[in-house]
Amino acid sequence: IKREQQPLLGQIALGVAAVPFLSILYGITKGKYNYKVLKYTLFFEDLPKEFEGYKITQISDIHSGSFDNKQKVEYAVDLVNKQKSDVIMFTGDLVNSKTSEMIPWKTTFSNLTAKDGIFSVLGNHDYGDYIKWESEEEKNQNFNDMLKLQKEMGFQLLLDDAKFIQKEDQRIAVIGVENWGKGFKQKGDLKKASSKIDANDFKILLSHDPSHWEYEVLKDNLHYHLTLSGHTHGMQFGIEIPGLVKWSPIKWRYKYWAGVYQKANQILNVNRGFGYLAFPGRVGIWPEITVITLKKGKRDRNNIF
């Protein structure tokens, strides 16, 4: 009996051992381009009535220096446009290390389009801090090239600044801060970015790192209705079953690491990222295109989002 069971037990052991290997293999070959469109409807009592049903598409963490499949990336850009949102908001990390990584993809991402334009902010990887430069002048030139590139692509880059989207006699404020992260560059100046806006404006804040929401935004005197972040990538590894399981090792580093959170009557969305970095794949945490619809109304247990 034992001789007959050993081959079966061996086969089971091999099968179990193969699961992580196959998962990683899938993540490298397919998962990193397995784009998912995640849709949320968010309710705000003080949303200006002219913006009822207003649609925002958020993308984050493009990391163009990692891409190796032009067709897949073009498909994803087309998928963003197919959402037909009123505005596109990009929350940083266009590149891995230097601006030139984006040059082969400039035309592709220049095809992004939305009625009210594209707003963007910088992430920690967009400053050229993760590469050794021959001189400070070369690093400064790289940064200036980043600013120029975003403008040429049609991105309205907000460097501690704010713009308004106007509909009839009502408006919403779009505020963008430079990178501010716990343990990372803390260049962003929320006070400066918000200096143009009124306290009663409906506010959408773009801030690359969700730790900024936790450590500064929630404590600020102004009420930021909706904050959009990225940065974590959900660690590109985890398990998500909607309504049942949401887990990634990144949870031990970031309290807010993927999806929608609500605190102090303010809402944060952490996008899982469009691209990938370091590990050349994604396992269980797929590249994300977020579509948010704004609705006027009171949030309760049945319609928080």
At which residue positions do the language-model features occur?
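N-terminal signal-anchor transmembrane helix
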Residues: 1-16, 26-59, 65-83
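Membrane-embedded alpha-helical transmembrane segments of multi-pass integral membrane proteins
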Residues: 20-23
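Soluble catalytic domains of enzymes that build or remodel membrane lipids, polysaccharides, and related
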Residues: 47-305
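N-terminal presequences and immediately downstream first alpha-helices
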Residues: 11-18, 225, 234
